[in-house]
Amino acid sequence: MIGVPVDAWHVWLGLSLASVALVGVGATLPTAPPPAAGDAADTVDRAAATAHPTTAEHPLDARSIRIGPRRIGLRNDAGTTHAAFAFGPVTPAVASRELRAVLRGAPPESRFASGEALCDAGREARRGTPKWRPVDGPLIVRRVVWEGCDVTLVG
């Protein structure tokens, strides 16, 4: 007789282990796609490219975000994606309380003494090393033009 004896215990054990392995592989597959960093970068570029002060928001489907002057990174359980900005550099407004306030709508004159002080804070923010931070809402982009300072804040 040619073939595997189906009544052998080791055949049943092997089939059982293979079934458990397949279920385990299926359970670890991501249930959602990786976040779309390109769409977020497009929102930033649209705001940065305009000639007038503007504000834009983009919903995020990520758990963590990393914003740099020239790139954005998003990650969730399904993976990590990155995208470069076409218009930059932009100013990550995550480490400075004053820049975050202006990003969220405060007039720049309420947080900074002059346009030069705003530009200095922007330069300092762009020098920092981007870090992964938890996402706590939509991506906000605000282009501010005030007293000779032209800066695009992202947070």
Model-identified regions with their sequence ranges:
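Acidic, polar-rich N-terminal leader regions of halophilic archaeal proteins
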Residues: 2-155
